[in-house]
């Protein structure tokens, strides 16, 4: 059977605006009973999901006993280093965040997205100056983006100056605040392990940042009538130092490994960790910031919460380049230095276009 054809001519901007003006997001489209994916969500054939490879074993790292046994600690450092060099991704279990906190956070955010559209509309905005933003496709109007993504999102800036409880939608504020406190501790632990994996002092990466920044993206992926035509999130790399992802049991996250797309299994109680662009740059390609994506499905909705750790683009003008201690005659710098603000501005202006931004800093 032939794939549905994309119409050659249509007023894309008008359709984007009509979708945006509903303030109901993708969930609103699904609730209206659509049976076909609107044109603005249809990806070019080359960007659509292909068959996934299943023979790879995704790395899982047990953090149990990390601070109690020096031998166990070294084993964990070695596993983190190996996964960061070969995959740029790994799962962690026994990470210290109670399952009850994870479940409550997923339930609270899901409850918000599954409210009546009229209730949600009051929170819908594209004003990124706000600390909490509910919207669909923040890069909706970017010309470089091949198609809108099949998801709705709550963005929230959780550090250094987190929102008050009153700034959050009622169902999810308290759980997100509690979760962000726990995930911040885990993030610092991971930065310590990653520092040691590079042969640096444990506190090196944590101390390297002028102003720590934690940004959370709560993504709701409704069921899609034609999942083969669109994507929950198109392939991309992450901007910061480290990303920690909490996902429900629906699955859908895929990682590019050895030129194959690999499913990341939704293991109960686990969190997914991946290396960001800035850590690949700082490590001079020792650690990898790897392309990943979220595919759409036609049965059930998916909920995920992504936490981005890095330097604040608003409060630091520090130049970041490959770490001097890692360089040598045999390992010269592969990137020119840049600021987080410059990199963030570039990505925000470009949107998710399916390519890595690191190439613009290559020497």
From Swiss-Prot:
PROSITE patterns: FE2OG_OXY. It comes from the Eukaryota. SUPFAM superfamilies: Clavaminate synthase-like (SSF51197). The keyword Metal-binding applies. Transmembrane segments: none annotated. Fe cation binds at residues 236, 238, 292. One of its GO terms (molecular function) is metal ion binding. Residues 212-312 form the Fe2OG dioxygenase domain. Keywords: Ethylene biosynthesis, Fruit ripening, Iron, Metal-binding, Oxidoreductase, Vitamin C. Belongs to the iron/ascorbate-dependent oxidoreductase family. PANTHER family: 1-AMINOCYCLOPROPANE-1-CARBOXYLATE OXIDASE HOMOLOG, OXIDOREDUCTASE, 2OG-FE II OXYGENASE FAMILY PROTEIN. This is 1-aminocyclopropane-1-carboxylate oxidase homolog. It comes from Solanum lycopersicum (Tomato).
């Amino acid at each position: 059977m032939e794939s549905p054809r994309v119409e050659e001519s249509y007023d894309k901007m008008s359709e984007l605006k009509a979708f945006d003006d509903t303030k109901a997001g993708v969930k609103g489209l699904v609730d209206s009973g659509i049976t076909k994916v609107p044109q603005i969500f249809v990806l070019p054939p080359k960007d659509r999901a292909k068959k996934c490879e299943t023979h790879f074993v995704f790395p899982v790292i047990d953090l149990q006993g990390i601070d109690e046994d020096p031998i166990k600690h070294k084993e964990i450092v070695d596993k983190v280093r190996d996964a960061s060099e070969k995959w740029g991704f790994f799962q962690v279990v026994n990470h210290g965040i109670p399952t009850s906190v994870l479940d409550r956070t997923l339930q609270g955010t899901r409850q918000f997205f599954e409210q009546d559209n009229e209730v949600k509309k009051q929170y819908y905005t594209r004003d990124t100056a706000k600390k909490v933003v509910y919207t669909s496709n923040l890069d909706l109007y970017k010309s470089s983006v091949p198609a809108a993504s099949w998801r709705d999102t709550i963005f929230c800036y959780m550090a250094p100056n987190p929102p008050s409880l009153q700034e959050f939608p009622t169902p999810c504020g308290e759980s997100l605040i509690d979760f962000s406190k726990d995930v911040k501790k885990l993030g610092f632990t991971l930065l310590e392990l990653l520092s040691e994996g590079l042969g640096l002092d444990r506190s090196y990466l944590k101390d390297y940042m002028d102003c720590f920044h934690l940004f959370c993206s709560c993504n709701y992926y409704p069921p899609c009538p034609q999942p083969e035509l669109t994507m929950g999130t198109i392939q991309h790399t992450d901007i910061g130092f480290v990303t920690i992802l909490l996902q429900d049991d629906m699955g859908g996250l895929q990682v590019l490994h050895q030129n194959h797309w690999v499913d990341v299994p939704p293991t109960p109680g686990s969190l997914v960790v991946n290396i960001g662009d800035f850590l690949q740059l700082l490590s001079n390609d020792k650690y990898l910031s790897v392309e990943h994506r979220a595919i759409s499905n036609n049965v059930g909705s998916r909920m995920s919460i992504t936490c981005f750790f890095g330097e604040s683009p608003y409060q630091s003008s520090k130049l970041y380049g490959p770490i001097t201690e890692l360089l040598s005659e045999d390992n010269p710098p592969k990137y020119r230095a840049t600021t987080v603000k410059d990199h963030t501005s570039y990505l925000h202006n470009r949107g998710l276009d399916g390519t890595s931004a690191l190439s613009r800093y290559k020497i």
